Every structure is written in C-alpha cells, then in structure tokens.
Amino acid sequence: MSKTIVRKNESLEDALRRFKRSVSKTGTLAEARKREFYEKPSVKRKKKSEAARKRKF
C-alpha cells in the first residue's frame, strides 16, 4: 500500500503526482487489474506463451 504525506506548502497536485508515481513504481494498480477476475491456469499459460512468442518476433 502506498502512502503519501502532503508536505508543508505543497500543492495537492504535486502530492497527487508523487502518489501516482509511487503506485506505478510498486505495480499496485497493474496487480489489481490482473487479479480483478479469476483466470483459469490454462488461460494463464496460453497468455504467457503468446507473450513469449511476441517477444521472440
């Protein structure tokens, strides 16, 4: 979980920018999107092999 404390004399936009940066660095949002719905193991394997095939070419 990411925490951002608003500093003294800091605008809300700057604090929000720091929060968004910390969330993207930790991968919290991407992980939540990935786990939003259950994915069968066979589908996971299929996606993994397709991604490897794309990386190869």
From Swiss-Prot:
PANTHER family recorded: MITOCHONDRIAL 28S RIBOSOMAL PROTEIN S21 (PTHR21109), SMALL RIBOSOMAL SUBUNIT PROTEIN BS21 (PTHR21109:SF22)
Pfam families membership: Ribosomal_S21
Similarity section: Belongs to the bacterial ribosomal protein bS21 family.
UniProt keyword annotations, A-Z: Ribonucleoprotein, Ribosomal protein
GO-annotated cellular components: ribonucleoprotein complex; ribosome
Record gene name: rpsU
Name under which the protein is recorded: Small ribosomal subunit protein bS21
GO terms, molecular function: structural constituent of ribosome
GO biological process, one term: translation
Organism: Bacillus cytotoxicus (strain DSM 22905 / CIP 110041 / 391-98 / NVH 391-98)
NCBIfam families tied to this protein: S21p
